Amino acid sequence: MSSDWDEIKRLAADFQKAQLTSTLQKLSERNCIEIVTLLLEKQLLDVVFTNDGKEYITPDHLEREIQDELYANGGRANLVEVSKTLNVDLSRIVTLAERIAAENPHIHLLLGQLIDEDYITHIAQEINEKLAQHGEISISDLTSQFDLPSDFLQQNVVEKHLGKIIKGRQDASNPRVFFTQAYIQRCKAKIRGALAAITKPTNVAVILQQINVQEKIFHSLLDEISPAGQVTSKQANAQYVPHIYAKTQADWVNSFYKQNSFLEYEAINKLGISDAKTYIRNQFPNEQFLFLKRVALGARLIELTVVSALNECSATKHYLDLSTILPSNLSEEDIAEAFDAVIAQKHCNPSHFVYLESIVFSQAYLTELVQPCHDMALALAKSAIDNGVYQQYIVEKTLAQKGNNLSTSHDADDDSKTDKRDERRRKAASGKAGGGAQGRETKTKSTKKHQRGRAAAHNHDSEDEEDTVQQSAGNTRKSVKALELVKSSDIINLIKITLEEEGLEHLAKPIAALYLNQLNQVALSKAQELYEATPQTNRRQTHAAIQERVNMLLVDIRLYEKGLKLFHADTQTQLVKYLLKSLGNEICNELTLYVAAECSLSVKSTNLNVDQRIKLIQELDAQYRNALLEQNKALNRSIEDFELATESVLKACSMIIKKADKKKDRALIIGHKEKLLQQLLECHEPALLLHLAALILFTTITGCILHASGKFVSAILQHIRASLNEPQNALYLVLQMLQQATPDSAESKSINEQLQSLQAEVVDLAQNYSRASVSKAD
């Protein structure tokens, strides 16, 4: 045991000797580098090299040095500056700074800077000093001063130390603003003193500029102060109006209105009130006002003065000078506006009055005034007939209409070509892009100056007679200038004598302008009546009407002929016979009756059969007899023979045969189809409904019209069957079978119900059928 202890002592002495003995050999710098490199490779040592690579340091020591730098800089250190001071790469500094901030809750890493609580406490003290000095601070000001984010300053500095280091309070309306109670009291005192000194309306902006108080604080403290006045609004142009001034204004306005029953906007504006209408409504909530452009008239003035005077004017059939009953300072424009407003509010019947230059005439007064002019208009009309002036006007008008009709025909042809081109473009566009733009027609509304009362009615009568020049598709069409039988000077000369007695001769021209068109229409109507009363005119009109009627029937026969030629020979023969029996017989009647009238023969019945016509033809002049007999015989022949015979009759009657215009055929076919559709919609009889539907489908499928009776329905359906799908054919077959069923049978009620249900489907098919629908169904 003792030997062991001795051994321990000996070893301790050797160890102490070894420690006290200096090393005889020292490692070189290269050896040290190799040793450290070896340790680093084996990951036995972790060091951080300096930027020049000559020195290295352990991360823990570097972390302590970063904290030392933070302390040396007063609690706020920029990592870039720390990197330069320690000569270490910035990324290493940032990494260690993030670790320091994560491990220590009192240190913050913010925008590349380390900030500790000591620095935050320091800037809180500075903020408190600034708040005490200025009374108010905002986060935006602090952000620019301390170069820190606004959210960090508000949450980690101001709000954290508010009430502790920072002595103040936060604005409830704006949490980014802080102020002291003393500052609020100073602002209250400034506002109270400024408002107490004001005696007239003053702009709020001027007040704020003088007392150096923010607008938000001014409006928030205004209710607490309870000033002797009110602010008009919280807008930029708001004004403060003292109660004493408002009372003075109200007293003046009340006094003026009580004396005059009206208020001028300009006078109210001079009192410092910008919106006069709103002020009047607020000042007199129980009063009714008529607000004009420059004045507001009270209801008492309107009811007791204007309305009563107008009623008296209408009752006495006289006139009224409004300038004598309205306030003298009203201009003529104000008076006109007041009259329009009274009429618009239906206090009086507008048709009873005419307003001219502040004078209101009753309609009865003007009617009596211009009564002599009616006799003059009738005399001028008779004179125009006697002199041939009106006859010349009729001839020129007829020639102009013929020229316009020819121009319209050319325009229609051009429009038809244009429509076809547009249709092709639309189809091409729809095939490529799924649709095209639809053409729109722009309508322009004329802007005419309308006169009051019934003046518009007098000027409206002859609008169609005005000079017009219309341009359409490059063609210029002119209408004959309207014949003016009555001149304005004629009316003025008649009414001026009466107006001079009343001192209203200056209104003779406006009154004449009101009635010029009406009197001219009276004269033209009388002239037309006298013109039509002559036998020569009656004969000419009858000749033109028969000529137009026969030509229309011939065009219809030609179009019907195209349709019936689509059927088999036997059916075609029957359709031709029916066509000539109906339309051909009508043409024969028209021409025979016309010739009988020309030969001064009286005919009791206008609906003649073949035998009656032949008997009547035997009594006619020889120049007509052969042609009419040949026409009646042609009714039993072909359509071509009948047309040739009819042309001979027209030639004998000196009537013009119009040439066939194939370009108008489509419009006639469409019009015929529309008439059939209208009859179909109004039809409730199954047989007639089936007949109309068959004709409509035939026109839609073939593009031709057909004149056929009900017995041809089966033939028509047989012809168009190939263009209908199976459900559509079955529908017509069932309807036809039900129609032919015995109405008195036991199943008549059931048959009627089925007919009613199928009729709607037939009407829908006839209306909406198209060739495209058949191809889709197939």
From Swiss-Prot:
Keyword Transferase set for record: yes
Regions of compositional bias (Basic residues) in chain numbering: 445-457
EC number: 2.3.2.-
A biological-process GO annotation: regulation of proteasomal ubiquitin-dependent protein catabolic process
A GO MF term: UFM1 ligase activity
Keyword flag Cell wall biogenesis/degradation: no
Region ranges (Disordered): 404-477
InterPro entries: Ufl1, Ufl1-like_C, Ufl1_dom, Ufl1_N
Top enzyme category: transferase
Any one GO cellular component localisation term in the record: endoplasmic reticulum membrane
Any single Pfam family the record assigns to this protein: UFL1
Keywords of the record: Transferase, Ubl conjugation pathway
Functional summary from the UniProt entry: E3 UFM1-protein ligase that mediates ufmylation of target proteins.
Family: Belongs to the UFL1 family.
Protein name: E3 UFM1-protein ligase 1 homolog
